């Protein structure tokens, strides 16, 4: 649990409930100067996201919030109105630097000091990434380097980046297998039913699943390039349905194959067109002159004129 120094009007310190790595298990007061929340540009979208810098950036975590309506926390003898659950998961900071390297390569296409590459007016705290030891140690995985005197210059290398990302995918595949995470057709995401891992699961299923996880932190272009580099075939499109079945499930009105309005004529016309029996033929020959219709016997008599 992390607490802010700023206190609201009620005098109660503002707090959150945070699930974090064990490296943050010490007293929050002792870590307040070395551990901070920083808003940076998310590598997977052109918007801000919250990250946690632990021990002056020696470890960086992505922070996500689980929030439900009408939720609060009981902390000691107090009620914390903000009922969000913050979850901090470690992330390789090179994923946060990669979009800046790609952008600089597209715009300038030359070797530059990394301090001139990782610049963002909207998120000025991005400079803190360069103070992280993991970034300095891993830049060579995704860039070409030149050293002039004591100064290093970097330029994004797509080939190196794909090799580095493939290693990330391979590591993820190993974790998926060791954790017995179901992939492929054995997963039903709607209900999250874990079925027995069948023999039909292929290595490609693990690779595609791992690629999907890694791609959440990549730009769209790099995501597609990685898919091709891994040799993942495009997912086959669904088999086209027969024309009759298409028409049945279509939202368009069903079209009749025959004009059924010809059966809408009245009974009299149908009877006249039908074949008459012998009795009906004999009755038709009888002289009906002077005969009254049977309905005439039931009609009211006309009043005589006075």
From Swiss-Prot:
Q: Which GO terms describe its biological process?
A: RNA catabolic process
Q: Where in the cell is it found?
A: Nucleus
Return the annotated region ranges for Disordered.
232-285
A GO cellular component annotation here is: ribonuclease H2 complex
Q: What sections of the sequence does the record tag as coiled-coil?
A: none
- State the signal peptide span: none
What InterPro entries does the database record attribute to this sequence? RNase_H2_suB, RNase_H2_suB_wHTH, Rnh202_N
Q: Which UniProt keywords apply?
A: Nucleus
Family annotation (Pfam families): RNase_H2-Ydr279, Ydr279_N
Composition skew (Basic and acidic residues), residue ranges: 259-269
Q: Specify where it is mainly localized.
A: nucleus
According to its UniProt record, which protein family does this protein belong to?
A: Belongs to the RNase H2 subunit B family.
Q: Any idea what job this protein has? A: Non catalytic subunit of RNase H2, an endonuclease that specifically degrades the RNA of RNA:DNA hybrids. Participates in DNA replication, possibly by mediating the removal of lagging-strand Okazaki fragment RNA primers during DNA replication. Mediates the excision of single ribonucleotides from DNA:RNA duplexes.
Q: How does it assemble?
A: The RNase H2 complex is a heterotrimer composed of the catalytic subunit RNASEH2A and the non-catalytic subunits RNASEH2B and RNASEH2C.
What is the protein's name according to its record?
Ribonuclease H2 subunit B
- Source organism (scientific name): Xenopus laevis
